[in-house]
Amino acid sequence: MSKILIVEDNEKNMKLVRDLLQYKGHQTLEAITGMDGVRQAIDHVPDLILMDIQLPDISGIQALALIREQDALRSVPVLAVSASVMPEEQQKIVTSGFDAFIAKPINIKQFIDSVQSFLTSGRKKA
């Protein structure tokens, strides 16, 4: 069973992602702010992190930078989950160090496939 941290401030989005992952047999951890996500990642060292970009305290990009400072978390894949559909925003997100971008609203099949791919293969770039 994989341990996946979901960092998402929207209750409906959190529930959808949590329910999908738990249905697929994964253990989930939850955080609703960027700093809480960083703390949870440090405390629990998940197998995968799903990070919203727009969070109430710090951005997902800022949270990712703090996560990547931790030696134990450098190999953990972090996937950005965002409603931003502008190509330049998506490019900024990916060049910030995220391993992949998942657009909201979530396409369930693509979402599950992406999660499974990263759980199987790990980070594509270290």
How does the language model describe each region?
Residues 25-32, 40, 102:
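Short hydrophobic/Thr-rich beta-strand motif most characteristic of the beta2 strand and flanking loop
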Residues 56, 65, 74, 86:
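The feature encodes the CheY-like receiver
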Residues 8:
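Conserved acidic carboxylate
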Residues 15-18, 62, 85-101, 113:
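Alpha4 helix (beta4-alpha4-beta5 surface) of REC/receiver domains from two-component response regulators
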